[in-house]
Amino acid sequence: MYDTPTSWDKSLHVPADIQKIVDTVKSLEDDGVRAVVTACGFFSVVQEILADAVNIPVFTSPLMMVPQIVRLIGSDRSVCIITASERLLVSDYLVPVGIESNMPVRIVGMDSSAEYYATHMGGTRTTWDVDLQRKELIEIVKNAVLRFPDIGALLLECSQLPTFSADIQDAVKLPIFDYIGFIDMIYLAVVQRRYSGIL
């Protein structure tokens, strides 16, 4: 895992310390790691850079799942991406992982979540009220579903949000795709299970 970078090149939308990240991924490969996952969906901008640097799979962002989800839910439904900031998740982060402008995608930010912004996205508070966060996030998702009745699935872009996936699903009864499901898929790709018994 490589956490959210502290400094971004605003003009290129890539981490200012990209070479450090590349070196880290190479070091992990040298240590025998079979796949690398980053810990911020906004790392989609460096997917190609990191994948080209090593000979193991690199998965930078659950945003990579969006083109597949679009095909799963039918052409009359949309995928709703729940992200830290609707304003910040611009096409620079979408195009590198195959999200095209004509895809039925709704982007909904957590900008109204006071609890999230107190502890993430530059917030300095070190304690996280998980129950309050759950309540705020469910409210954001419920409002999104009311605003966009065509939503057929949700993608939680942030690595902190799978904590609440089951609660969100209970509230809106929709398929939820998140970082943990993404990682489970990756794990099974590089550590295949064995089958036995009557086949």
What are these regions (language model features)?
Residues 49-73, 169-187:
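Short, acidic/small-residue loops that bind anionic groups at enzyme active sites
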Residues 39, 129, 133, 153-157:
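Glycine- and other small-residue-rich loops at beta-strand/loop junctions that grip anionic moieties
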Residues 1-19, 85-88, 92-128:
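N-terminal glycine-rich anion-binding loop in soluble enzyme alpha/beta folds
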Residues 78-82:
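Conserved beta-strand elements of the Class I
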Residues 133-150, 163:
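A short, acidic, amphipathic alpha-helical segment used as a generic capping/interface helix at domain edges
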Residues 157, 161-163, 177-199:
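C-terminal functional extensions of proteins
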Residues 35-47, 58-65, 84-88, 157-163, ...:
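Gly/Ser/Thr-rich loops at beta-strand to alpha-helix junctions
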Residues 1-39, 49-51, 144, 150, ...:
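Metallocofactor- and cofactor-centric catalytic cores in central/energy metabolism, strongly enriched
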